[in-house]
A protein has these predicted regions:
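A short linear hydrophobic-aromatic micro-motif
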Residues: 34-36, 80, 90-94
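Short S/T/G/P-rich N-terminal loop/turn motif that feeds into the first structured element of a domain
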Residues: 1-72, 96-100
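C-terminal structural segments of small proteins and small subunits
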Residues: 67-89
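C-terminal end-helix/capping segment
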Residues: 84-100
């Protein structure tokens, strides 16, 4: 079993967000994580959140514990602080669950 997060973002700076992805992916892979799906969304038909969403993706980890370790990793937090906060207006957690 693996652990999957489904996320929705409102990306406001595509170039800066791409830099974030390029820098964080090696860290993500070092934890055994990866992106399963990644979509740019042009229209949201229904949402439980008031946040705008223009990007939807899944991010997969070997376990919830590994996911938690990744998101608290100092190297990841430095990349997030440098690129993510200036490129994303809002974050919507759509779902977290065990996956086959």
């Amino acid at each position: 079993m693996s652990f999957e997060r489904i996320m929705g973002l409102d990306v406001i700076n595509d170039e800066e967000y791409q830099r974030y992805r390029e820098c964080m992916i090696p860290i993500l892979k070092s934890f055994g994580g990866n992106f399963g799906f990644d979509f740019k969304v042009s229209e949201v038909l229904k949402s439980k959140s008031d946040n705008a969403i223009n990007r939807v993706f899944t991010i997969d980890f070997p376990s919830k514990e590994v996911m938690d370790a990744f998101f608290s990793d100092q190297s990841y937090l430095e990349v997030k602080n440098q690129y993510f906060k200036n490129s994303v207006k809002s974050v919507t957690l759509i779902s977290m669950h065990e996956a086959n």
